[in-house]
Regions:
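N-terminal segment of the mature soluble domain
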Residues: 20-69
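N-terminal signal peptide c-region/cleavage motif recognized by signal peptidases
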Residues: 3-5
Length: 129
């Protein structure tokens, strides 16, 4: 079966046997009920994974090869900006990488995509070790 690149779809994993060898990810967020900018960042990261050709988003931590744990707090009264701590941990509990991000609601899409690339590079480095 030949796939035209424009018709290729992102990996989806309701059945992990369909995509053997695909890297599965889960995003777990910890933020307050009113922290809308933090929530928007977590959703943007989940969306970036769902659109990715290299990764598959899963909802069950037991099915995840890596977990992205995001702790965030909105830093202004309008809930337009958030300070976020992102930690990537392997299924074996090994710390892969950690970074801190300031994100505004206006640029969460770009930040989610950029951080997915950052995480991909960190995972590739960890696999070479």
């Amino acid at each position: 079966m030949w796939l035209h690149p424009a018709l290729a779809r992102a990996a989806t994993c309701p059945n992990l046997n369909v995509h053997p060898g695909i890297t599965t990810l889960i995003v777990q967020g910890d933020y307050g009920e009113k922290d809308q900018a933090s929530k928007a960042y977590v959703v943007s990261l989940q969306d970036a994974i769902k659109k990715s050709q290299n990764f598959c988003y899963v909802d069950d931590v037991r099915a995840a090869t890596y977990a992205l744990d995001v702790a965030g707090v909105d830093i202004d009264e309008e809930h337009e900006r958030a300070a976020l701590s992102v930690v990537v941990v392997s299924e074996r509990g090994m710390l892969i990488t950690h970074w801190v991000r300031i994100s505004s609601v206006d640029n969460v899409g770009k930040n989610g995509q950029d951080d997915l690339h950052k995480m991909d590079r960190a995972i590739q480095r960890a696999k070479r070790r």
